[in-house]
UniProtKB/Swiss-Prot annotation:
Organism of this sequence: Methanoregula boonei (strain DSM 21154 / JCM 14090 / 6A8)
Catalyzed chemical reaction(s): 1-(5-phospho-beta-D-ribosyl)-5-[(5-phospho-beta-D-ribosylamino)methylideneamino]imidazole-4-carboxamide = 5-[(5-phospho-1-deoxy-D-ribulos-1-ylimino)methylamino]-1-(5-phospho-beta-D-ribosyl)imidazole-4-carboxamide
Gene3D superfamilies named among the record's database cross-references: Aldolase class I
Cross-referenced InterPro entries: Aldolase_TIM (IPR013785), His_biosynth (IPR006062), HisA_bact_arch (IPR006063), Isoase_HisA-like (IPR044524), Isoase_HisA-like_bact (IPR023016), RibuloseP-bd_barrel (IPR011060)
E.C. no: 5.3.1.16
Gene, per the UniProt record: hisA
Entry's Gene Ontology BP terms: L-histidine biosynthetic process; L-tryptophan biosynthetic process
Keyword set includes Transmembrane helix: no
Stated name of the protein: 1-(5-phosphoribosyl)-5-[(5-phosphoribosylamino)methylideneamino] imidazole-4-carboxamide isomerase
Length: 236
């Protein structure tokens, strides 16, 4: 199973949010420095989110992210504020391994098919942000139907990966909710990366046992609650 340390970028800085709220941001310095820290500790993949994009400025941090992708040279999944096929193509041109489509994929599902056909399904990841079993969109403020149904639709449209985020536990460092993860993995055939609540070695073990492709480590990694080398060891 792959481990993806999170590098979330807001205003040119590496930050972590609680429950996706901008005002909760804790800054951890330069994004490239954070990325190198995790790579030096053994990471061979990163989960990069352009939070300025998620909050409305899709072009912000483009040069920074392009430099980060080039400098690190490892597997990178990239998301945050992608609102058009043109946006997605520009971010894929940075060299990121794959891009994450969330609200845009719900609003325009055919974009998954278009991008998968143009760039290959392995470079298209559909984001399934779930709140109480419903897909959450627009900064997790609205719901748009059963998360399993959407995951299956994204798979049928050609997405090569799914990113599942349990909004109910994201950023709280309280552990994952196993049931919804297992339900999702049991209902699709494409690889699933899990984010939200991964805060202990036992969470990594549970995700591996459940058949997840990968786990995103965010707040718990930056706070020191989970150790990257232990998570990597557990994932092997």
């Amino acid at each position: 199973m792959r481990i993806f340390p999170a590098v979330d970028i807001l205003g040119g800085r590496c930050v972590q949010l609680v429950q996706g709220k901008r005002e909760s941001a804790t800054a951890y310095g330069d994004p490239l420095t954070c990325a190198r820290r995790w790579i030096d500790a053994g990471a061979d993949a990163l989960h990069v989110v352009n939070l300025d994009g998620a909050f409305g400025d899709s072009a912000k941090n483009a040069d920074l992210i392009r430099g980060l992708v080039k400098e690190t040279g490892i597997e990178i999944e990239l998301g945050g504020g992608i609102r058009s096929v043109e946006d997605a193509a520009r971010w894929l041109d940075t060299g990121a391994s794959r891009i994450i489509l969330s609200t845009f994929a719900i609003k325009e599902p055919e974009s998954i098919r278009t991008l998968s056909q143009e760039f290959g399904s392995d470079r298209v990841m559909a984001g399934v942000d779930a709140k109480g079993g419903q897909v959450a969109i627009h900064g997790w403020q609205e719901t748009a139907g059963d998360y399993i149904g959407w995951a299956q639709r994204f798979e049928q449209l050609g997405a090569g990966f799914l990113l599942y985020t349990n909004v109910d536990v994201e950023g709280l460092q309280g552990g994952i909710a196993a049931g919804p993860v297992r339900r999702l993995i049991g209902n699709v055939r494409i690889p699933v990366v899990v984010a939200g609540g991964v805060s202990a070695r036992a969470d990594v073990a549970l995700l591996k046992e459940s058949g997840a492709y990968g786990a995103v480590l965010g707040s718990a990694l930056y706070s020191g609650k989970i150790n990257l080398s232990e998570a990597l060891e557990e994932s092997r």
